[in-house]
Amino acid sequence: MKEVNDYFVPWLKGEKMYLSSHIELAWENKSLHRLMSNENPLPPSRKVLDAISRYGKIANRYPEQGKDVRKKIAVINKLDGMGNVLIGNGSSEVFDMIWRSFLQPGDEVIQHTPCFGIYKLRCKALGGKLVSVPMIYRDNQLLFDADGIIKAISPKTKIIVVANPNNPTGNFMDGKDFVKIAETGLPFVVDEAYVEYAGLAKSQVALVNKYKNVMITRTLSKAYGLAGMRFGYMLANEQVIAQIAAMLIPWNVGTIAMWAALAALEDVKALEERVKFNNEAITYYENELKDVPGLVVFHSYGNYILLDGHGAGKKGDDMIAFALKRGLILRPQEPIYGNDGFFRLTIGSKKENQMAVKAIKDFFKS
């Protein structure tokens, strides 16, 4: 007689639930400073908190399909209407819906590396194969390689995904390279989780009107500071949206989350304040750390900074351990290019940023 384990799909057997150990650590030790998960250090605006309070009172009712917030998103992005917008329980769910819509077991997803880990997780959960194209590390810069992505295409390729700006490197890919990839006709996902920090002029959303295969994903977890509310969205051709929407779990976005999202999108002043705070902090880090011998600080258009201490003979993991002793959680980075000197930090409060700068300087003096 078979056991229940015999019925699991083969690519799921032995796999474990994704666990963000650094987030678990932060919740278990609330005195630690969270400079590791690209969260916004500023709390939601008063208008958002008012919306949460107001709509929390009708949390006993099922939500509708987010018509108001989808219309607002379409207006912001100069698209025809809410038919060009799909909303999800964070952009992680949006990726899951896209992957489910295009992938069968054995199909391939092409990504750049280093990059956001969710692409691999959702690909693996569906029995797909991830094909990684390394960025080019040259002259202390990590550069996109669009030609490398195109060369990696095979008959099994079903999705190409590029984060713009990239996480964790913080840089943008050239516009002409997006066109080059879009011209392949393959489903092309552009992850713009952090684009608000540089402004929507850097978005590739205009490609949606020209290329039916281009899909833009965004989140309100970063510049808008709603990571705990779980709200993300996709922008694409209306027919593509309609087909992917068939994968939606009914009522996938709760009432409180969608109205909090709408309040955040309408509160332009609050967004501007958060972007200004973040970008000034990026400049602060760059100015403070530029003269640390052997340390490479990659310029970032996000709310995080990638650093490389290899030139000083320092290991990223040792920096993480050193910072933790001072109450700071920074983010480790797996070795790339045979280099174990990389680590990453998230922009924090003014005090936290000062603490992080001091910790980094002290570590590199040791």
Mark where each language-model region is:
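N-terminal "arm"/small-domain region of PLP-dependent enzymes with the aminotransferase-like
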Residues: M1-R61, K72
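Short loop-beta-helix segment that forms the pyridoxal 5′-phosphate
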Residues: P63, A74-M97
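Conserved PLP-anchoring active-site segment centered on the Schiff-base-forming lysine
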Residues: S101-R122
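Conserved PLP-binding catalytic core of the aspartate aminotransferase-like
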Residues: N279, V292-R326, F343, I347
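PLP-dependent enzyme catalytic core of the Aspartate aminotransferase-like
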Residues: F322-R326, P335-S366
